[in-house]
């Protein structure tokens, strides 16, 4: 209730609607958010990256990988309806997975949460072929719970989700580095260090990436910033010394 008192009332984002084709509810939902983020993406392109014909759908790992290929971080939302509302209030549509069937006979469905009305306890979603579909809080929460509260906020490197915390954000950013998208990883690490300048982890991530790229000047500068926040961390001092040594030998 405290969170709800801080929210705008009511709220509805102008998210482009893309009606799903065939079994493309996931690609259509992702394409809607990509368009909202000013990216030119269509459901066919996203389906080519994520759709599994044998499953007649897109599984969550493929959906996240497709988002990263578009340059969007799929930040994992906490299992919190309040955080979901908070993201929408901050201007972030949320990609959600619902189970519209039963636990023993699931009917998986992706949708985009884009608005709410607290007074009537109504949520608004782009869902399948239905734009701005109205659903009660209770009904949504039931279908969301049966999908284990799966939700992702898709953001570019210029935005940080309203409910983001440093370590989950950096883990999500690291997925870009692990898949070879180093320029994007660098951009998200930079955003983390700007958004949480007193947290050493963002500076450490930037330092390690710069070190791996052979940029010892940047690596030593970022290690130094990390040490300012965590001066008692021996491993940081070691890494800083290695970077300084490599820089002097270059």
Residue ranges and their predicted role:
Residues 1, 118-204:
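Noncatalytic regulatory segments and standalone regulatory/sensor domains
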Residues 2-80, 84, 90, 159, ...:
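Cysteine-nucleophile protease catalytic domains, especially the papain-like/related folds used
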Residues 73, 77-126:
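Active-site-adjacent substructure of cysteine-protease-like catalytic cores
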Residues 195, 229-230:
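Structural marker of alpha-solenoid helical repeat scaffolds
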């Amino acid at each position: 209730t405290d969170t709800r008192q801080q929210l705008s009332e009511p709220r509805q984002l102008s998210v482009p609607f893309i009606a799903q084709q065939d079994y493309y509810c996931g690609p259509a939902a992702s394409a809607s958010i990509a368009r909202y983020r000013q990216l030119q993406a269509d459901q066919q392109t996203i389906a080519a990256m994520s759709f599994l014909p044998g499953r007649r759908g897109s599984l969550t790992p493929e959906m996240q990988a497709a988002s990263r290929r578009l340059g969007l971080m799929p930040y994992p939302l906490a299992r919190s309806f309040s955080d979901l509302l908070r993201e929408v209030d901050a201007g972030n549509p949320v990609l959600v997975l619902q189970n519209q069937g039963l636990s023993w006979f699931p009917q998986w469905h992706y949708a985009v949460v884009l608005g709410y009305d607290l007074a009537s306890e109504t949520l608004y979603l782009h869902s399948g072929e239905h734009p701005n579909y109205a659903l009660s809080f209770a009904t949504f929460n039931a279908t969301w719970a049966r999908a284990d509260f799966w939700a992702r906020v898709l953001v570019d490197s210029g935005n940080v989700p309203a409910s983001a915390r440093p370590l989950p954000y950096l883990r999500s950013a690291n997925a870009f580095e692990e898949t070879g998208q180093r320029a994007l990883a660098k951009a998200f690490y930079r955003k983390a260090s700007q958004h949480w300048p007193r947290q050493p982890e963002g500076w450490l991530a930037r330092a390690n990436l710069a070190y791996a790229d052979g940029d010892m000047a940047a690596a030593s500068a970022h290690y130094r910033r990390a040490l300012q926040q965590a001066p008692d961390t021996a491993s940081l001092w070691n890494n800083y010394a290695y970077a300084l040594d490599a820089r002097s030998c270059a």
